[in-house]
Amino acid sequence: MAACFVCNKKAVYGKSVTFSAERNSRVFKPNLQSVKIRMPDGSTKRVMVCTKCLKAGKVVKAV
């Protein structure tokens, strides 16, 4: 599974519970976006970053 380049957030497993209390396995996936970022050495790299890190400004996009 893919993970966030910044915070290493990845898919977690849990249960979906119906009205009659039946439990089925399911996967909670992070909202990952493929973005081109500028690395500290000045180069660019395409990585997967979660939207929470994008909104917080934890990465600098390469334009």
Swiss-Prot record:
Keywords: Ribonucleoprotein, Ribosomal protein. The keyword Ribosomal protein applies. GO terms for cellular component: ribonucleoprotein complex; ribosome. Disulfide bonds: none annotated. One of its GO terms (biological process) is translation. Coiled coil: none annotated. It comes from the Bacteria. Pfam families: Ribosomal_L28. GO terms for molecular function: structural constituent of ribosome. NCBIfam families: L28. PANTHER family: 50S RIBOSOMAL PROTEIN L28, LARGE RIBOSOMAL SUBUNIT PROTEIN BL28A. Belongs to the bacterial ribosomal protein bL28 family. This is Large ribosomal subunit protein bL28. It comes from Hydrogenobaculum sp. (strain Y04AAS1). The lineage of its organism: Bacteria, Pseudomonadati, Aquificota, Aquificia, Aquificales.
